[in-house]
């Protein structure tokens, strides 16, 4: 199975660089995975697709202002993108500079926001492949420093500096647990009134946590997808969520994941539980689960997701869920119908294709 099987041509003007004025004002493409039929709708029509007793699972991670601008103490500009906070004073980060800092190098960060001479210092203590371990010398915890001097880490394809409005719009309204460097973007379409309408309809709601890493934007750099090594991200699925999933399945209702990160959290927990002969069990660990055509989904019955990059692991996940041909036809239609793509773009609602295992490239 080749990465090129998941290519499609996307005109640049279809990449959404700003969100819609209202969260729910996006369009929605409804794809029935079983029949392959798709239909153009508006996002607020999603309320008609979700039934009483269904369980809607969201990812409650909160994006940290993870991008810092600065310089080496010896001179030379650099950009830091925090990937993971290790403790109150250490983090792993990507560092972009004309020359990579060496072990022991001192970095001065945040002067663009705090003023010249008011930046804070970090020492590069170790390198772990593409990531640099940074130790912050300040008394304040890393999260506090990022809140003061960090920028929202907008994806590279948005191709503009972050603005004040992004601090709100690049977060879901239910985000709670600090740790992501990218938003779980399917959730950006939900506002509080929509959540209240779902609850009033008798739809159950649960939250998992997966801290989305910068690796989600990395291109697949191999020809055969079986050679791809998936990046790891930390995920949590609590006992309470497991109980809700089991209760939903027992009544014949659907488990609906909001976003691919929710899917990966739930299916990681299910995959780990399979060894114990269970459908799903609590999960608190890193996951590098890679779902592509030929892989099965043990728990998730339907999916809300945005439109993803060509040749990305996320369009591979959607193809595994809805069927390869169904997915590529729906994407072709989305391009022709001028849907808006990627993080600030439009959404899909997909019912699982029970025959997806037979629909391979």
Swiss-Prot record:
SUPFAM superfamilies cross-referenced by the UniProt entry: QueA-like (SSF111337)
Chief location of this protein within or outside the cell: cytoplasm
Pathway terms, separated by semicolons: tRNA modification; tRNA-queuosine biosynthesis
A cellular-component GO term for this protein: cytoplasm
Keyword set includes Transferase: yes
GO biological process: queuosine biosynthetic process; tRNA wobble guanine modification
Record has Cytoplasm as a keyword: yes
Gene Ontology molecular functions: S-adenosylmethionine:tRNA ribosyltransferase-isomerase activity
Localisation: Cytoplasm
EC annotation from Swiss-Prot or TrEMBL: 2.4.99.17
EC primary class: transferase
Pfam family, one: Queuosine_synth
Catalytic activity: 7-aminomethyl-7-carbaguanosine(34) in tRNA + S-adenosyl-L-methionine = epoxyqueuosine(34) in tRNA + adenine + L-methionine + 2 H(+)
Disulphide bond pairs: none
Function: Transfers and isomerizes the ribose moiety from AdoMet to the 7-aminomethyl group of 7-deazaguanine (preQ1-tRNA) to give epoxyqueuosine (oQ-tRNA).
Family statement: Belongs to the QueA family.
Protein name, entry field: S-adenosylmethionine:tRNA ribosyltransferase-isomerase
Organism of provenance: Actinobacillus pleuropneumoniae serotype 3 (strain JL03)
Gene assigned in the entry: queA
């Amino acid at each position: 199975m080749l990465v090129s099987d998941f290519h499609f041509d996307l005109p640049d003007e279809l990449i959404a660089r700003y969100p819609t004025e209202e969260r729910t004002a996006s369009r929605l493409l409804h794809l029935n995975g079983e029949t392959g039929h798709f239909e153009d709708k508006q996002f607020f029509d999603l309320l008609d697709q979700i039934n009483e007793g269904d369980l809607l699972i969201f990812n409650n991670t909160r994006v940290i202002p993870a991008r810092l601008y600065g310089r080496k103490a010896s001179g030379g500009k650099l950009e830091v993108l925090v990937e993971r906070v290790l403790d109150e004073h250490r983090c792993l980060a990507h560092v972009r500079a004309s020359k990579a800092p060496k072990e022991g190098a001192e970095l001065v960060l945040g002067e663009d926001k705090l003023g010249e001479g008011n930046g804070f210092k970090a020492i590069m203590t170790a390198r772990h492949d593409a990531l640099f371990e940074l130790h912050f010398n300040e008394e304040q915890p890393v999260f506090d420093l990022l809140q003061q001097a960090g920028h929202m880490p907008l994806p590279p394809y948005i191709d503009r500096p972050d603005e004040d409005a992004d601090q709100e719009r690049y977060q879901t309204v239910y985000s709670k647990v600090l740790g992501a460097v990218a938003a779980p973007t399917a959730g950006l379409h939900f506002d509080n009134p929509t959540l209240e309408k779902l609850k009033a309809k008798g739809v159950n709601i649960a939250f998992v946590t997966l801290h989305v890493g910068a690796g989600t934007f990395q291109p697949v750099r191999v020809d055969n997808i079986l050679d791809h090594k998936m990046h790891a991200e930390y995920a949590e699925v609590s006992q309470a969520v497991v109980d809700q999933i089991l209760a939903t399945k027992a009544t014949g209702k659907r488990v609906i994941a909001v976003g691919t990160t929710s899917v990966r959290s739930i299916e990681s927990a299910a995959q780990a539980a399979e060894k114990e002969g269970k459908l799903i069990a609590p999960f608190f660990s890193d996951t590098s689960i890679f779902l592509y055509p030929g892989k099965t989904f043990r728990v998730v019955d339907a999916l809300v997701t945005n439109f993803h990059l060509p040749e990305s692991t996320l369009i591979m996940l959607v193809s595994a869920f809805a069927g390869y041909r169904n997915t590529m036809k729906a994407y072709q239609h989305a391009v022709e119908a001028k849907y808006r793509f990627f993080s600030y773009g439009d959404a899909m609602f997909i019912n699982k294709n029970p025959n997806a295992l037979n629909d391979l490239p």
